[in-house]
Design a protein with these regions (language model features):
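N-terminal single-pass transmembrane signal-anchor helix
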Residues: 1-34
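Extracellular/periplasmic head regions of type IV pilus-like filament subunits
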Residues: 63-128
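Low-complexity, S/T/G/P-rich flexible repeat/linker segments used as non-globular hinges
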Residues: 120-154
């Protein structure tokens, strides 16, 4: 009788390890970009919530000019729980049409975080929004929201 040896050869195991390494090299950067995009969308949602708070404050106090973060009951870094990834800045703008008070919210990624270099997210009083892809576009300054701009970067 012939006795057959069962099992895998070293070459077969090396091929499997190589395939797993290639898949991991492709999947990990994709996963990181997915997480980055998810955090950006969370911040966009948070900006919309902050915009509602600003509007509530404006209705109650008839102005936004001079309001502080504590007056508006908003934090300066988000997310509030966990590691902050963005700083939020409310910029009141005066002397617009009919002397109406207007504002712009800008979320800027904090350096040395997972969102670092992801670009500014901007929302204004009209609900117009934009996102600057990366830090090198517009010389590192935020985009200007318009009726044709969007958060998807297109």
């Amino acid at each position: 009788m012939v006795n057959k040896i069962k099992g895998f050869t070293l070459i077969e195991l090396m091929v499997v390890v190589a395939i797993i390494a290639i898949l991991a090299a492709i999947a990990y950067p994709s996963y990181q970009e997915y997480i980055r995009r998810t955090k950006r969308v969370e911040m966009q949602t948070t900006l919309q919530q902050i915009a509602m708070q600003v509007q509530r404050y404006k209705i109650a106090n008839f102005k936004v000019i001079g309001a502080t973060s504590s007056d508006l009951n908003i934090a300066t870094s988000y997310p509030i729980q966990g590691t902050p990834l963005y700083t939020v800045n409310l910029t009141p703008v005066t002397a617009r049409a009919l002397n109406a008070e207007t504002w712009v919210l800008t979320a800027t990624p904090i350096a040395n975080t997972s969102q670092s270099g992801d670009g500014d997210i901007v929302l204004n009083y009209r609900g117009e929004r934009c996102w600057t892809k990366g830090t090198d576009i517009n010389s590192g300054t935020a985009c200007v929201p318009s009726t044709t701009s969007n958060w998807d970067g297109k």
